A protein has these predicted regions:
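Short helix-coil boundary/hinge micro-motifs
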Residues: 1-152, 159-160, 198-199
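N-terminal cysteine/histidine-rich coordination modules
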Residues: 154, 158, 162-163, 167-199
């Protein structure tokens, strides 16, 4: 459970927004910044997820209805579960099913760009647009290989989503100096206790 945020690797570019989305619930402290529809609306607005590229975001925040609020929380849980699978290389089928179900409700389009790239772009309005951005960023990260580096800390009392920037992609903890160190100390203590037991 790292308390030093500077030790936690932020995901690069737009994937950082998805990382923040996954970390909007803090397992260590038991806090959730997306407790209400108003919280979700404010969170999306802070990250400009209610607007398209080149558009100015309206001053009035779109309302997030009950159905969209439920979808946001389901999406966060499912994406956290999928990120957890990045250590093993296999995502939980129920999490994938949830993301697919939500994605089917969000209108999207493939956009071709002048630099010979394609982008998945959400077309909806309000919460639908914001959910679409989370999905589009995740889609892009999965296709570029960046998603596989977004993981949940192996410390069960932490579970922070971190970006594994290690060369060999074997990062396990959000911070080696806290969660990783604690795990190593526990393992050492268990080995010492095992040696101290009479035969």
């Amino acid at each position: 459970m790292s308390t030093d945020l500077s030790q936690r690797a932020p995901a690069p570019g737009a994937l950082g927004v998805v990382q923040q989305f996954l970390n909007s619930v803090d397992i260590a402290s038991g806090t959730d910044v997306l407790r209400t529809s108003a919280d979700v609306s404010a969170w999306f607005a802070e990250r400009r997820l209610f607007s398209r590229p080149g558009e100015q975001q309206a001053d009035a925040l779109p309302e997030v209805g009950d159905a969209d609020f439920g979808r946001v929380l389901q999406l966060r849980t499912a994406l956290r579960d999928i990120a957890e699978g990045n250590l093993t290389g296999r995502a939980a089928p129920s999490a994938v099913e949830t993301v697919n179900r939500i994605a089917a409700l969000v209108p999207m389009a493939v956009r071709f760009d002048t630099d010979n790239t394609t982008l998945l772009t959400p077309l909806g309005e309000g919460a639908e647009l914001a959910i679409g951005w989370i999905l589009a960023i995740t889609f892009d990260a999965m296709n570029t290989g960046m998603w596989q580096r977004l993981r949940l800390c192996a410390a069960t009392d932490c579970r922070f989503a971190f970006y594994d920037a290690s060369r060999n992609r074997t990062g396990t903890w959000c911070s080696m100096s806290t969660c990783g160190n604690r795990a190593k100390v526990r393992a050492y203590q268990q080995r010492q206790r095992g040696r101290a037991l009479p035969a």
